[in-house]
């Protein structure tokens, strides 16, 4: 895996763990973990989206804010790498 992707994945994992902790959810999170399955609510997802934007200094385009893109750390990683690579945001 490329260093940038590893860095993005680690940062996303950190943000996800922070949101889970703030929502009193204790879970072992892996890149493929389905966040809804480990207990993240829709409000938690909104919080996660905002924290991801802040962490990566991005404004996600509306079309990227989908359940599929926030399904797992891996899905968010792909979306973020795409945004960083496209120079948008």
From Swiss-Prot:
Q: Which UniProt keywords apply?
A: Phosphopantetheine, Phosphoprotein
Alphabetized PROSITE patterns for the sequence: CARRIER (PS50075)
The identity of this protein, by name, is Aminoacyl carrier protein 2
GO molecular function (one): acyl carrier activity
SUPFAM superfamilies per UniProt: ACP-like
Any idea what job this protein has?
A: Aminoacyl carrier protein. Can be charged with L-glycine via the formation of a thioester bond between the amino acid and the 4'-phosphopantetheinyl prosthetic group, catalyzed by the bll6282 ligase.
So which domain of life are we looking at? Bacteria
| Source organism (scientific name) | Bradyrhizobium diazoefficiens (strain JCM 10833 / BCRC 13528 / IAM 13628 / NBRC 14792 / USDA 110)
Spell out the post-translational modification annotation for this entry: 4'-phosphopantetheine is transferred from CoA to a specific serine of the apo-form of this carrier protein.
For the modification O-(pantetheine 4'-phosphoryl)serine, the affected residues are 42
- Name all Carrier domain ranges: 6-84
- GO biological process entries: lipid A biosynthetic process
One of the record's GO cellular component terms: cytosol
One Pfam family from the record: PP-binding
